[in-house]
Amino acid sequence: MSVPASIMTSVHQPPTPRPRYPSDLSDTAWSRIRSLVVPTHHKGGRPCLQARWREYVDALLYITRTGCPWRALPHDFTAGWSAAHQHFTKWTRTGLRQHLLRVLGEETRTRAGRKPKPTAAIVDSSSVKAMPVAGPRGCDGAKKIDGIKRHILVDTTGLLLAVHATPANVQDRAAFGDLLHKNRCATVRKVWADKSYTGTAPAEAAAKAGIDLDIVCGPKPAGGLVVQPRRWVVERTNGWINHHRRLVRQYETTLAAHEGFLMLSQIGLLLRRLDRGQLFDTL
């Protein structure tokens, strides 16, 4: 049913055409996720236009890529920063980002001739400096970084399976169990890790999840960088993550918000890959 023009609000009016940003969804990418993002039913009130939902996603991808503050979102995003922030928070509560990652990851693997669900994965962590306004933090004594540590689990092609953010003073072996708990891919049966995941706690967490934990110990470097077997894949994923300015520092007041932006970065990456047909080689 159409809404009378006299009572239309910005939610019911189609967004004004604007110049496109590099982070914007293509028409093909939007058609791929539209049915997952746009609600099929409403609990009252007037339904929001599908074009408005696309604006919300574009706004979130823009913030993730450029690192701009919420209130600095360009005004030509007619959805507005407040509405975009509300949907960011809502998707954290409903788990929509995890669902999008799973669906897009399975499609990417299938198109590359692999099984939809991986059976092996690689784990790693990286420490990120936190801004003064950020929330929980700690000091990574080894890297001399005051901030947070993000622990990620990726498949053998580098696609994100799970992320867990902690204060930087939390050891990798202590966070491994929580990271596995956030992994929704039950088919993973083997995980490669570095020496920071040795000890009783990681072994018990892996055994509880039915996973074979393999510690990769590379040769002592004779000079220069030595690539460790298997583990170089997760290092490449860390490089992809750092292409997004919102993630090179911790700006968020909660650790869950940082996890949310990290998942958004990988959702945008998967959509671009599926558009271009470049499934595993490049951005």
Residue ranges and their predicted role:
Residues M1-L283:
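Short alpha-helical elements
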